[in-house]
A protein has these predicted regions:
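Short, acidic, metal-binding catalytic loop of nucleotide-sugar glycosyltransferases
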Residues: 35-44
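Active-site-proximal specificity loops/subdomain of glycosyltransferases
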Residues: 4-17, 21-22, 53-110, 118-119
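Catalytic-site signature of metal-activated, phosphate-bearing donor transferases
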Residues: 1, 87, 91, 119-294
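Acidic ATP/Mg2+-coordinating residue in the GHKL
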Residues: 49-50
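Short, acidic/polar
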Residues: 26-35
């Protein structure tokens, strides 16, 4: 067996790991998601999936050709192609991603397709982390930077003046940030984390030299979670009544729209459709797996 000596410096300062995917998102919204992350400083994305529709494969292929996306196929660990079966593969996919990239990523960014960690004061992740560490008064970075979850429910009224596929610009009303460690998303040092799951580093190495986690102040950044409200009519009404408008994302608008427009133009030249493509939808994707008998 060949011995591979890892690079002394990680190739990527920020790399995204997406677990076994479920839920739906159209191809244009996926482009906005990946381009927003790239604008903030992410230089590689690792996605785990069981099967992809032709439209999604084409969109993914565009980003694979650019060298910014790696797709790993991971069928469910049991012959159950429902949402429940899909979730069983999530821990394995994230820990596989962490191990694969332990010496490639300085920071592993754990998010899903309907989430993005957005700075409220800074233009990119590098400047944001520099500010966080300065506030902490230490030079040594921590193992995990944890960002509180904020729901940007798609039930809230959208800003119709924004383009239909620019989800982060259209939906700017959010509920109260969740408590610390309740459904957060994180930046993780993969060389100091022994086990990871979809919110933060679960177990650090016993001799880890760094502080375990930082609860990032919500005035600095939050994890924006775009989804339908599923908490029941009464609670959803309460969320809606107390929702606040956050326009801090609009400072990214010009650059983000340019990036998305350029990417969509490239996809059109490649004859890639911009119609709705089911990325990670359990009923669609795992149905495809059954049909193809992977």
């Amino acid at each position: 067996m060949p011995i591979v000596v890892p690079d002394s410096m990680p190739q990527h300062k920020f790399g995204v790991c997406v677990a076994i995917a479920f839920g739906s998102i159209d191809s244009q919204t996926f482009v906005e998601w990946i381009e927003f992350n790239r604008l903030l400083g992410v230089t590689e994305f690792n996605v785990y999936n069981a099967s992809l529709s032709d439209d999604v494969t084409a969109v993914f292929g565009h980003y694979e050709a650019l060298g910014v996306l790696r797709v790993h196929q991971m069928p469910p660990p049991v012959p159950d192609y429902s949402k429940r079966g899909a979730k069983l593969g999530s821990p394995a996919s994230l820990n596989d991603c962490m191990l694969r990239n332990a010496y490639r990523f300085r920071h592993m960014v754990v998010i899903d397709f309907d989430e993005i960690i957005v700075p409220k004061q800074h233009d990119n992740y590098t400047a944001m982390l520099r500010h966080i560490d300065k506030r902490r008064g230490v030079k040594q970075p921590c193992i995990s930077y944890t960002f509180r979850n904020e729901y940007y429910f798609l039930d809230y009224k959208a800003d119709e003046s924004q383009q239909s596929h620019m989800r982060s610009l259209r939906y700017r009303r959010h509920g109260k940030p969740d408590r610390f460690l309740f459904a957060p998303k994180s930046f993780i040092n993969p060389r100091e984390c022994l086990s990871v799951f979809n919110h933060y580093c679960w177990i650090s190495f016993p001799d880890a030299s760094q502080q375990f986690t930082v609860d990032v102040d919500t005035s600095i950044a939050t994890s924006r979670h775009f989804r339908r409200c599923g908490f029941g009519a009464t609670e959803c009404q309460q969320y809606n009544a107390s929702a606040e408008l956050d326009n801090s994302v609009l400072r990214f608008k010009a650059k983000l729209e340019r990036r998305v427009t350029t990417a969509l133009d490239s996809l059109r030249q490649l004859n890639v459709t911009n119609n709705s493509a089911q990325i990670g939808d359990v009923n669609t994707i795992y149905g495809l797996v059954k049909k193809t008998k992977m």
